[in-house]
Regions:
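Jelly-roll (double-stranded beta-helix
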Residues: 1-233
């Protein structure tokens, strides 16, 4: 079963310096039907104005992933990390016993556009940690590339959660198939463009909540960038 969630049905908040779409209940947006999917808790699509950002704030017991689409995100945290996150990088922060961090757009004239993703951990109260990797465009072109995984042997950021996160770029005749365990859940988030998933066309900002399926076929992309999550039920 594939359940379509249209882009315009997401929560939305306009704070002036921050414009944010919420795929699931978050902050002032609450929808009891969309509290998460499996152990995926948050997907926020954020646009941060030049010179603005999120001041220092805390998290605990959450796997937090940032995926920058345009502009650059400046990260600083209580573990001593001071990093710039450009497009093409994936950043993972395991909050564990507690971490303080901030994110800013230090550009003078460019908005930073990124996704922030929260996944519930399968181990609580671990030591906080940070990881950042560059994902080459060619590794995502025409196929799904694993970018976050609980398996430390994978060439992806390591998360302490029963979930795998993939990214792909699809255009024209490019296609890929993704095998699913029907006992688990999956989530497809189309960042931009358009894409057919099992014959159903979705557009930028749309999502598919997937359960009881054994295969996803991604095809007929038009400048599509997509995230696919394999999730604990």
């Amino acid at each position: 079963m594939l359940i379509l969630r249209k882009s315009q049905d997401r929560g939305y908040a306009d704070h002036g310096w921050l414009k944010s779409f919420h795929s699931f209940s978050f902050a002032g947006y609450y929808d009891p039907q969309f509290m998460g999917w499996g152990n995926l808790r948050v997907i926020n699509e954020d646009r941060v104005a030049p010179g603005m950002g999120f001041g220092k704030h805390g998290h605990r017991n959450m796997e937090i992933i940032s995926y920058v689409l345009s502009g650059e995100l400046a990260h600083e945290d209580s573990m001593g990390n001071i990093k710039g996150i450009p497009p093409g990088d994936v950043q993972r922060m395991s909050a564990g016993t507690g971490v303080m961090h901030s994110e800013f757009n230090h550009a003078k004239d460019q908005t930073t556009h990124f996704l922030q993703i929260w996944i519930e951990p399968n181990v609580l109260e671990i030591a906080p940690s940070y990881e950042q990797k560059t994902i080459p465009k060619e590794s995502k072109q025409g196929k799904l590339c694993l970018i976050a995984s609980p398996n430390t042997k994978d060439n992806a950021v390591h998360i302490s959660a029963d979930a795998n996160m993939y990214a792909g770029l699809f255009d024209q005749t490019q296609s890929d198939e993704f095998l699913l365990d029907p006992a688990r859940k999956a989530y497809v988030h189309l960042i931009r463009g358009s894409l057919d998933v099992n014959g159903q066309t979705i557009h930028g900002g749309d999502a598919l909540l997937v359960q009881d399926e054994t295969l996803l076929t991604l095809s007929n992309g038009k400048e599509a960038e997509v995230l696919v999550f394999d999730l604990a039920p």
